[in-house]
């Protein structure tokens, strides 16, 4: 009976010759990964504001998801059919379940109940938290001191925002929106870890998510789900269609998959927690959403933890 070699038993991030273990490629790939993560931060900061605007306007959460996948699939489906082998469809179905439908529906439903500042904290601050938890549960990896401190800071910020949401007398239903945001974060964290393990490539990951999500979701939406999209103005349709379908579904998802492959799921997810500060300032300027003292402190703490984690020293195996 033959035994599997140690290399075969290792995950992609632990194999010799990968980005994590090649000193010659580490610095260049790290900068590329950080740059890609920075693009995602900008895209998702706008995503929080644009999605909140749509969810409190003429669109249901189901309308938002339909626009996201109708537009993205129009661009991506031909490449999916051409480039993805049928034997790999189950793997891409799983990626679409977590990085596509699960994330989008949880997030859009949350935007209908809670402000975009909460999304910035619970989604983008929650992703590194869930990523670390899932890594600990599935691999037992030990975290560096800086990563542990950054997670503590992120968690502290989440607790501050949670306290405000749960006990706010004017909007008692915000807690449900926050729970939905945390579910969206968990879904995206699973997606990031699967991308890191399976290494589908950024383009294949994007077209796979868009194509499969559209094929599954759009018939259900047209036949059974509540919709108010018919009453929306053309300008609102264009804004949501372009941002949700191109910027969020294609550009941001592709850059995140690229960043995950270059710097690991842990560091890429940490960078995303920088979104709250950008989202809060944008929401204040564009949506007139106030930032309370407690929320402001929580946003600062989460962002500090994200920055510390994203730029923590790399160990031999990036995860």
Q: Predicted regions: what is each one?
A:
Residues 2-63, 156, 166-197, 215-216:
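Glycine-/small-residue-enriched transmembrane alpha-helix faces in small-molecule transporters
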Residues 29-33, 57-66, 85-90, 163-186, ...:
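Juxtamembrane helix-entry segments on the extracytoplasmic side of multipass membrane proteins
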Residues 54, 64, 110, 137-143, ...:
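Hydrophobic/aromatic residues within transmembrane alpha-helices
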Residues 63-74, 99, 108-142, 184, ...:
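Specific alpha-helical transmembrane segments that line the substrate/conduction pathway
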Residues 67, 104, 119-126, 194-215, ...:
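Helix-helix packing/entry segments at the starts of transmembrane helices
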Residues 73-76, 130-137, 151, 167-226, ...:
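Transmembrane alpha-helical segments that form core, pore/gating elements
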């Amino acid at each position: 009976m033959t035994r599997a070699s140690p290399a075969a038993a290792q995950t992609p991030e632990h194999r010799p010759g990968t980005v994590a273990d090649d000193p010659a490629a580490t610095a260049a790939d790290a900068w590329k990964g950080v740059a890609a993560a920075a693009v995602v931060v900008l895209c998702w900061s706008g995503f929080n504001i644009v999605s909140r605007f749509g969810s409190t306007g003429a669109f249901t959460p189901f309308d938002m998801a339909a626009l996201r996948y109708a537009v993205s699939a129009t661009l991506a489906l031909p490449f999916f059919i051409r480039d993805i082998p049928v034997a790999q469809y189950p793997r891409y179905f799983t990626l679409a379940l977590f990085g596509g439908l699960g994330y989008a529906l949880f997030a859009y439903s949350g935007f209908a109940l809670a402000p975009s500042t909460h999304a910035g904290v619970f989604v983008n601050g929650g992703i590194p938290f869930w990523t670390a938890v899932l890594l600990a549960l599935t691999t037992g990896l030990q975290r560096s001191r800086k990563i542990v401190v950054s997670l503590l800071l992120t968690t502290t910020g989440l607790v501050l925002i949670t306290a405000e949401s749960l006990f706010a007398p004017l909007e008692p239903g915000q807690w449900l929106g926050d729970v939905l945001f945390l579910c969206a974060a968990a879904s995206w964290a699973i997606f990031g870890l699967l991308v890191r393990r399976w290494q589908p490539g950024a383009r294949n990951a994007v077209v796979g998510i868009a194509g499969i999500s559209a094929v599954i979701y759009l018939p259900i939406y047209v036949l059974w789900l509540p919709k108010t999209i018919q009453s929306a103005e053309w300008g609102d349709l264009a804004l949501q269609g372009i941002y949700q379908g191109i910027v969020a579904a294609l550009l941001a998802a592709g850059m995140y998959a690229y960043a995950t492959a270059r710097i690991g799921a842990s560091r890429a997810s940490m960078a995303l927690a920088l979104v709250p500060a950008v989202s809060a300032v944008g929401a204040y300027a564009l949506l007139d959403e106030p930032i309370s003292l407690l929320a402001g402190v929580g946003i600062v703490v989460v962002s500090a933890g994200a920055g510390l984690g994203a730029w923590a020293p790399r160990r031999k195996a990036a995860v």
